[in-house]
Amino acid sequence: AGINDWGGVSPLTPDHVNPEAPWPHLDKLSKDTEKAGKTLAERLTIYPDYIREGDWVDSKFITPILELVDAEYLPKMDSWTPGEIVEPPLSVLQQIRDRASPLNQNIKDIFEKVDEGQLLNEHEVVSLFEARGSNFSAVCDKANELRKTVNGEEVSFVINRNINYTNVCYFKCQFCAFSKGKLSENLRGKPYDLEHDEIGRRVAEAWQRGATEVCMQGGIHPQYTGQTYIDIVKTVKDEVPEMHVHAFSPLEIWQGAETLGITLEEFLQDLKKAGLDTLPGTAAEVLDDEVRAVICPDKINTSQWLSVMRAAHQVGFSTTATIMYGHVEQPVNWARHLIRVRDLQIE
């Protein structure tokens, strides 16, 4: 009939509405709810939709409330948050390791679709992200099973050095270590812009210590042009011709081409001739303009990010893709991000 909330259920207070027939123990209620294809999840006294909209909540309470909830605006069951250097709680890690079968028919149907090699739609990907309890364990187990099929059990690594050539940036996103200004100087240090000789020295030092790759990115310096990025690549190859250069996000590629007045393909060809080997898929944040309008409104949009990567593939580059989660986004935004990356791979 559409019910999605058990009214009056509380582990803290008795059932004052119907004291003669109190609510069953939460464990039993949880199991009965799960058998019906639903998941029992605690909520705050504020419904998730009201937290999501934000305008309903007084501004001084928004941050404290958001610190209490997960991406679905339901209460977190532990104090762990994304971005911390500690591992998630053991209870979560155990759920990931458990080999459970999904109880939710919708999850079962999605698994069947995956086994048949069909592409999942946005709603189905969101359903996987929103899985809880044994359904969550089943999704993790299924993902691990697919990983084994696609990649096997061998794990490789590369000895790499990150070289950030500048932390000066004219974009205004506040989450980035390259964002400089009065509000960030005490947290991120003084502005710097490495000379090419210093970049070369760091490349040589990395090679001497066993590195075979350098990853180079930085802020979008107002004085940088596309030629700056070309010269940085040449600096690396002049110092150590064998060094693999993994550098420049789609944002830097977009800005570089724009400053030189050439197409993305032409600029990427110039970088390739200079010695660029692969491109990192950073500056993606979340590939959904609904989120980007909040966290990075002045950066390239989703379509522009994808167009850079599409051009890179056409030129012959291999690329990666990143996602930055744990801020204002929701599972639907993760789903859109992954689907857009998947569709670009298929192209």
PLM feature segments, named:
Residues A1-D15, D32, T39-R43, V240, ...:
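Conserved C-terminal portion of the radical SAM core fold
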Residues A1-S134, K148-V150, R201, W207, ...:
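Auxiliary Fe-S-binding modules of radical SAM enzymes
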Residues P11-T13, L44-P48, R161-I163, I220-P222, ...:
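Active-site-proximal loop/turn and secondary-structure-junction residues that shape catalytic pockets
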Residues T13-P19, R161, K180-L183, L187, ...:
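Glycine-rich, proline-tolerant flexible connector loops at the mouths of alpha/beta enzymes
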Residues L26-S30, G200-V203, I230-K234, E265-L268, ...:
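Generic structural signal for well-ordered alpha-helices
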Residues A138-L183, P191-Q217:
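N-terminal pre-triad scaffold of radical SAM enzymes
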Residues C173, T212-E213, G226, I230-I323:
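Radical SAM/AdoMet-radical enzyme domain recognition
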Residues N186-G200, H221-D238:
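Active-site loop-helix segments enriched in His/Asp/Glu that coordinate
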